[in-house]
C-alpha cells in the first residue's frame, strides 16, 4: 500500500501533520481553567469565565461522600468520589449566568458567570 507513495507525497503529508500540531496545542491552551473545592458546599460558589472560550473546571471533593457536579444549562455532569478530584470540560458559552449543583445534595449550589 505504501510502496506506491512517492517521497514527495510522504513529505507533503508529514508537513501537513506538522502544521496542524501547533493549532491543536493553541486551542488546548485557550481553555480557561477554574479550580473549585467541595465539602458540602462549593468554594468559591461563584465562578467567572470569559464568553466564547472553553472552560476547564477542576473540582476537588474534600467531603466524606461522593458528589456529582451537575449543570443542566451547561449540559455537564460528573460523579467525583470522596476525597477525589476530577476535571469537568465545559464548551464555550455565551455571556450569562449558569447554575451548577451537587446532584446528591441539591442545597449545594453555585453559579458560573460568563462575561
Regions flagged by a language model, labelled:
Residues 2-13:
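Bacterial N-terminal signal peptides that target proteins for export
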Residues 59-61:
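Asparagine-centered strand-capping/turn motif at beta-strand->loop junctions
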Residues 23-28:
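Sec/Tat signal peptide C-region and signal peptidase I cleavage site
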